[in-house]
Amino acid sequence: MASRAEPARVVILLATYDGAAFLADQLASLEAQDHPDWRLVWRDDGSSDESAAIVQDFANRQAQGRVERLAVPEGHVGSAAGFLALLRYVALGLGPGDVVAFADQDDVWLPFKLSRAVQALAALPREAPAIYSARQVLVDARLNMLSVSPRLSVPPRFPASLTQNLATGCTVTMNQAAARLVAGSKAPPGCQHDWWAYLLVTAAGGRFLADEEPVVLYRQHGRNAVGAPRSFVRRGWAALRRGPGVFMGVLRQNVAALDAQRHLLTPEARMQLEQIQRALRGGPMRRMAALRLPGLRRQTWAEQMVFRLWFMIG
């Protein structure tokens, strides 16, 4: 068993899909990490470009066993399903002090990315699930700085995690307990892997660590699976334009997925979930009562006003 004095082993999960244009930068940033004890497990999602060849060439230059390819499931399954397949593959082999980090194919990690996550998670009890996320430097396709992702104004917790995702996948790192929790669960169809991890860990009483130091150059370009709005005000405006249908559909789906796995949740989370379910089945009075639940809110007043409107009418 690993001791606290030993550096944590990091298992990096990488899902590739037609990412040849940017992969070399990301792989080089893994080699530049000041936390040296990592291994990479990757899966290609049916790329039509040289993505798989680029990662394989990288693997050939590493020590034997440091890079491993997962061949299943075959074909194109999408980003979320690909990452969850990788997580399930590695979860049982994790040691007590090991951590898992998601890596997007088109970003660049700053050299201290892993070490900050490892240090933050090491300060918490190993037996409790914990998930780490950090701010990002938003850059264009050529790595020119655009802005820095906003600070979180409200502590991330459940049930706020039902209303929006605050765990940006390219920064997410989980301890063994969180990784096994998520790997053993069933995510709702279409839910991004990072949001599901954040949602489930917080509903299960785990810790969410939000690092205010940016640790990733997060590329914004036309082929991102999911981009990052530069401010929470823009997120609120984007939600307003989409209307209540999409948002409330996602909310109901996530509520149903948690309800189907109630045994994983804390008693408090189960009670909160039941109140939200009653509100979604009921009329205005029940919905107004649910909106008074502590923590059922989004990050800013603009986002919160949109959320309240959609919750009442959607």
Protein language model annotation of sequence segments:
Residues A2-R230, G314:
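Nucleotide-sugar donor-binding/catalytic module of glycosyltransferases
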